[in-house]
């Protein structure tokens, strides 16, 4: 039964705001007179803690059980530690701040106000690094969708701007106009002269607030109290992240879908009552079935928004400031806490009981009804967590035949109580091995015994090296290029490349997927609800392919709305699973753990099926497919083929791949990256085709390998064209760093597009840093030699009396490569790049229209590097070495330059021999 409890918190009254901590027990109650009290809602008799806080509070956000943020009309952004009662000034601004929220799992905070910019502060950073985003109008209120990583900014001109926060720099993706109230804050109360004038003119301007109630409780003497300072424009987000609500200017609540930002339905209060603008609006945090709103008449209305029915309504005598939902200890009963302008709070107890949310989403409902493939990814930790002797790394190995006796994955109920067809329901009680913990990061809960707590996520580990001796029990895991594990978060990247990245967020019932792009001018980010637990993904410029490794379902979703998406079920044998998928605008490819290689056209029509060695990774470009295999007999191998319109051509078929599996030894027992190798036992971070169509692979050794001359089987070879560990070492000034990592995206000519990851994990987390570029460098340098050369340079500077402070700064700068060593590397790099480009031109012709100019520039760089080496040999009077280098020069003008260098070095015999080379080449050209 619903009951209302009034609790006086501040005897002196005043504007009082409430915010509830994630534990649903710690309630922060802030008063504008400079006090904040911490109440324990589960122990109402307990004496509350009292903190001295800032006056003129404008918003409060309790984002953890021990910290909350506060903004003030004086422009202060503050953070408070509940445990230590410590206040921390994060930033100060000239104009008032109006609202705040916390993003990226508490790593950053967003503040908005009258300064015409959004301020992002890094909370984890001691200096609280600030990022400012210019906006067109003053901020009214802000809110954050943690599931989809979206920030909604309401402005005083009535516009709502939606920003994607999936990358470091927020990206505006949509704008809603003419829905919310265009409302400017009334700050005349802050000016004493203006405030007195307004009091003398008319004390009854706020006739919107009149109501028949006790005058002692109804009248608020605070000059800040007026309709303009109470109206809510904040976007309310559904806990699943796929819907949001707006408090609209027509005094209705409008529900929108994040898919296309389309209006789903409109909720209104009782038509017989006096309508008024809303002062707060919130979805219930449990399942999002209910939405609560309070209007300027202090009338609380709670809707079941899915049925559009009013669940509860009540009009309060006290003036309400804001509201906060509370989940009771039984995890199903909901209370509502309301702040007031009189120093008290009201608690509406037993307001509602959570029911299973059945959010209407046509595309999801249709797909679910057709295929009934919802996958609950909570199955594989029962053995891991229930047995202390089992190691995390053991999850890499499992006899695949154990999966052969799996029971049916679900039961289907077609008819509901009403006799109408309903969405299928699934029973997972007996299906503990339905889906594996595919990232090995411990995010799947084991089957919970009745009346017992869930298992702890902390388990013992012991070493288990990966070698050919263990391949009999090797577990094939789903792989997507540059995919990341969940780790200990609720989100991960399914895949990423030069086009963009696909992320998924898991909640209690399903996953939510976001497809984001680096080129925001060309593509538009989109979201959808994933009921099937997709764990495979491939992104291209036209669309995205998703796959579920255990059920065999694949789905292709074009980026535009012109072409329709399609879904297909891949037949799987007992114990077989899809291990990798790839898609181009013309072909879709699926590989499995038993070696089935299936190809389809862009509309899902089967093109071919083939049996190979077990496939562990795939990528594709146009009609070409690069696949990696792994078997206990042959280790790692690769295939390169072209799927023509009428036939398939193999360039390479299951040839040895010069890579080894990562060795998980005792040293990695406590390694923070053990989760990654559980998730990806191959250690392949990504594989892709270069911009000129050459296969590339980036493994656990952080070296980029490129397949050269692959069109000629006798000449093909793997070339190490970049050792990223060496490049990081050079950029760090010769220091061995363990907190900077390279995450590959693509190879564009001679530049690796990548994400520079900072931190203990080798994979990128949220938000995604901006892509960086790293020029390829052939691995020819020796660290000890480079350090010796740089030390010698510093010693020379000391001899000539260089500034000591400047010298200390030099030590932190990038390692300088001596001229002779740099020339050797440039010579080799130019040679490799020119060979690759020549091979492309001879077989595929020009792809971008400037290949011949690029090739000429490469030949010039090649000869210049050789001439530097030639000059060094001449200065050392090493005629034989100089002559060998002269033979490698390509252009006649380079030979002419070599002659001049030889003359300057007074080596007449070398001059004569080089002239003979020139004459021989000239005669050969005449033939």
UniProtKB/Swiss-Prot annotation:
GO terms for biological process: DNA repair; DNA replication initiation; DNA-templated DNA replication; double-strand break repair via break-induced replication; establishment of sister chromatid cohesion; mitotic cell cycle; mitotic sister chromatid cohesion; nucleosome assembly. The modification Phosphoserine is found at residues 377, 379, 398, 463. GO terms for cellular component: Cul8-RING ubiquitin ligase complex; nuclear chromosome; nuclear replication fork; nucleus. It is found in: Nucleus. The modification Phosphothreonine is found at residues 401, 411. Present with 3280 molecules/cell in log phase SD medium. This is DNA polymerase alpha-binding protein. It comes from Saccharomyces cerevisiae (strain ATCC 204508 / S288c) (Baker's yeast).
């Amino acid at each position: 039964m619903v009951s209302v409890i009034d609790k006086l918190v501040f005897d002196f009254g005043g504007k009082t705001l409430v915010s509830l901590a994630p534990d649903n027990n710690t309630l922060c109650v802030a008063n504008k007179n400079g006090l904040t009290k911490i109440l324990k809602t589960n122990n109402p008799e307990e004496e509350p803690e009292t903190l001295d806080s800032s006056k003129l509070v404008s918003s409060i956000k309790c984002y953890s059980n021990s910290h909350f943020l506060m903004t003030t009309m004086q422009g202060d952004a503050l953070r408070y530690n509940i445990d230590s009662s410590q206040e921390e000034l994060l930033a100060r601004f000239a104009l008032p701040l109006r609202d705040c929220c916390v993003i990226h799992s508490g790593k950053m905070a967003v503040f908005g106000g009258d300064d015409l910019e959004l301020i992002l502060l890094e909370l984890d950073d001691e200096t609280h690094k600030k990022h400012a985003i210019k906006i067109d109008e003053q901020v009214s209120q802000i809110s954050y969708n943690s599931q989809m990583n979206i920030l909604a900014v309401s402005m005083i001109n009535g516009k709502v701007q939606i920003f994607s926060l999936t990358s470091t720099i927020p990206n505006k993706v949509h704008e809603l106009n003419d829905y919310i109230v265009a409302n400017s804050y009334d700050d005349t109360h802050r000016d004493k002269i203006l405030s007195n004038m307004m009091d003398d003119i008319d004390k009854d301007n706020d006739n919107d607030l009149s109501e028949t109630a006790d005058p002692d409780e109804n009248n608020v003497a605070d000059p800040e109290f007026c309709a303009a300072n109470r109206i809510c424009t904040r976007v309310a987000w559904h806990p699943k992240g796929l819907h949001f609500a707006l408090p609209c200017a027509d005094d209705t609540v409008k529900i929108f879908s994040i898919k296309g930002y389309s209006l789903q339905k409109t909720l209104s209060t009782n038509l017989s009552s006096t309508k008024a603008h809303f002062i707060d609006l919130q979805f219930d945090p449990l399942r999002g079935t209910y939405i609560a709103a309070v209007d300027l008449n202090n009338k609380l209305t709670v809707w079941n928004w899915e049925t559009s029915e009013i669940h509860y309504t009540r009009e309060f005598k006290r003036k309400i400031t804001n509201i906060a939902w509370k989940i009771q200890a039984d995890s199903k009963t909901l209370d509502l806490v309301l702040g007031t302008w009189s120093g008290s709070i009201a608690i509406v107890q037993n307001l509602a009981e959570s029911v299973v949310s059945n959010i209407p989403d046509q595309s999801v409902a249709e797909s679910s009804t057709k295929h009934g493939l919802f996958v609950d990814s909570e199955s594989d930790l029962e053995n891991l967590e229930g047995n202390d002797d089992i190691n995390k790394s053991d999850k890499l190995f499992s006899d695949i035949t154990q999966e052969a006796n799996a029971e049916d994955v679900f039961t289907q109920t077609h008819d509901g109580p009403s006799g109408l067809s309903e969405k299928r329901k699934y029973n997972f009680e007996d299906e503990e091995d339905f889906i594996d913990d595919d990232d090995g990061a411990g995010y799947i809960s084991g089957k919970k015994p009745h009346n017992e707590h869930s298992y702890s996520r902390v388990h013992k580990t012991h070493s288990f090296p990966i070698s050919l001796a263990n391949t009999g029990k090797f577990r094939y895991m789903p792989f997507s290029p540059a995919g990341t594990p969940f780790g200990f978060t609720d989100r991960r990247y399914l895949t990423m490349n030069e086009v963009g990245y696909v992320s998924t967020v898991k909640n209690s019932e399903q996953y939510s997927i976001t497809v984001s792009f680096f080129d925001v001018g060309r593509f538009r980010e989109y979201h959808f609800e994933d009921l099937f637990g997709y764990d495979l993904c491939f992104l291209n410029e036209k669309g995205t392919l998703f796959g579920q490794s255990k059920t065999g379902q694949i789905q292709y979703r074009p980026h535009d709305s012109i072409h329709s998406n399609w879904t297909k079920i891949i037949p799987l044998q007992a114990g077989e699973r899809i291990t990798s998928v790839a898609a181009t605008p013309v072909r879709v490819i699926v590989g499995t753990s038993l070696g089935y290689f299936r190809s389809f056209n862009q509309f899902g029509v089967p093109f071919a099926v083939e049996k190979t060695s077990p496939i562990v990774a795939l990528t594709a470009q146009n009609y070409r497919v690069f696949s990696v295999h792994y078997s206990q007999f042959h280790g790692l191998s690769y295939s390169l083929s072209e799927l023509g319109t009428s036939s398939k051509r193999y360039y390479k078929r299951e040839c040895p791949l010069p890579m080894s599996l990562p060795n998980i030894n005792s040293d990695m027992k406590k390694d923070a990256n053990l989760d990654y190798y559980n998730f990806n036992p191959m250690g392949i971070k990504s594989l892709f085709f270069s911009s000129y169509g050459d296969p590339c692979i980036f493994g656990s050794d952080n070296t980029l390998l490129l397949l050269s001359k692959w069109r000629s089987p006798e000449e093909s070879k793997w070339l190490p064209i970049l050792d990223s560990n060496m490049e990081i070492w050079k950029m760090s000034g010769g220091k061995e760093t363990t907190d900077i990592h390279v995450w590959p995206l693509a190879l564009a000519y001679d530049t690796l597009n990548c994400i520079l990851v900072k931190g203990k994990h080798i994979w990128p987390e949220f938000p995604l840093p901006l892509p960086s570029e790293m020029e390829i460098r052939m691995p020819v340098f020796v660290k000890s030699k480079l350090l010796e050369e740089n030390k010698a340079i510093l010693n020379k500077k000391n001899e000539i009396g260089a500034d000591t402070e400047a010298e200390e700064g030099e030590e932190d700068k990038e390692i300088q490569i001596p001229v002779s060593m740099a020339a050797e590397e440039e010579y080799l790099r130019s040679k490799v790049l020119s060979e690759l480009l020549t091979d492309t031109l001879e077989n595929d012709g020009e792809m971008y229209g400037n290949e011949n100019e690029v090739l000429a520039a490469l030949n010039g760089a090649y000869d210049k590097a050789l001439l530097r080496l030639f000059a060094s040999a001449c200065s050392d009077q090493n005629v034989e070495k100089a002559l060998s280098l002269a033979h490698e020069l390509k252009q006649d003008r380079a030979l002419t330059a070599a002659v001049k260098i030889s003359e300057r070095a007074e080596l007449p015999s070398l001059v004569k021999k080089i002239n003979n080379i020139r004459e021989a080449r000239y005669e050969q050209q005449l033939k």
